[in-house]
Amino acid sequence: MASPGGQGGGAVSTRGAGARRMKWALELSLGNARGRGDRQSNQGDVMYPIGYSDKPVPDTSIQETDKNLVEKRCWDVALGPLKQIPMNLFIMYMSGNTISIFPIMMVCMMAWRPIQALMSMSATFKLLENSNQQWLQGLVYSVGNLLGSALAIYKCQSMGLLPTHSSDWLAFIEPPQRMEIMGGGMVL
C-alpha cells in the first residue's frame, strides 16, 4: 500500500499549481514489478483476493440446463410425427381423389414414412434413453406414426384402391352400381 506520507512511488500525483492529492492503491503482488515472462515463474508471490479458491467448482447449473435440453429434444423427437399430420391432411385435400400419378405418389409417401419410422424405432429410442419420461415419449411417437399410417389407409380407401366390397374378391359378384353420376354441376 502507498504510505500516507507520499513516499509510495506513484502514489502521489500533482495537479495544477502545486496541489497534492493522495491516491490509494493496493498491490496484489508481494515482489517488485515483474514483466510478463516472470509471472509464470513466481506464482507463489501473488496474493489472491478474498474468497478466491484454487480448486475448480463444479457448475451444477450447466448440468441442470443440459437435462432440460435433453428433455426438450426428446419431446421434439416424440412429437415429430404428430406435427406432420396437419401437413399430410393438407396434402390429402390438395391431391384429390382421382387416380393419377401425383395422388398415388403422395399416398405412397404418406404410407412409407410412418412405416419406416416404426421400423427404425430402436434407433430413435436410443436417443430417448437419457429422458426421464422415455415410455411416455415412446408411446406418443408410436401413436403419431400409427395416425400417419391411418391417414394413408384412409386416403387409399377414399381413392377406391382398397378392396372393400365383396365384388373385389369374388369374380361372380357384380360390382355395385352407382345410383347417381354428377360432374361439374351438369347432369350427365
From Swiss-Prot:
Q: What does this protein do?
A: Part of the endoplasmic reticulum membrane protein complex (EMC) that enables the energy-independent insertion into endoplasmic reticulum membranes of newly synthesized membrane proteins. Preferentially accommodates proteins with transmembrane domains that are weakly hydrophobic or contain destabilizing features such as charged and aromatic residues. Involved in the cotranslational insertion of multi-pass membrane proteins in which stop-transfer membrane-anchor sequences become ER membrane spanning helices.
The protein's assembly and partners: Component of the ER membrane protein complex (EMC).
Organism name: Salmo salar
Keywords linked to the UniProt accession: Endoplasmic reticulum, Membrane, Transmembrane, Transmembrane helix
Instruction: Indicate the principal place this protein occupies in or around the cell.
Output: endoplasmic reticulum
Task: List the transmembrane segments.
Answer: 72-92, 104-125, 133-153
Where, per UniProt, does this protein localize?
Answer: Endoplasmic reticulum membrane
Q: Which Gene Ontology cellular component terms are annotated? A: EMC complex; endoplasmic reticulum membrane; membrane
The record gives the membrane topology as: Multi-pass membrane protein
Regions of this protein lying in the Lumenal compartment? 93-103, 154-188
Instruction: Identify this protein by name.
Output: ER membrane protein complex subunit 4
The GO biological-process annotations, alphabetized, read as: protein insertion into ER membrane by stop-transfer membrane-anchor sequence; tail-anchored membrane protein insertion into ER membrane
Family, similarity comment:
Belongs to the EMC4 family.
Residue ranges that the UniProt entry lists as topological domain Cytoplasmic: 1-71, 126-132
InterPro entries per record: TMEM85/Emc4
One Pfam entry for this protein is EMC4
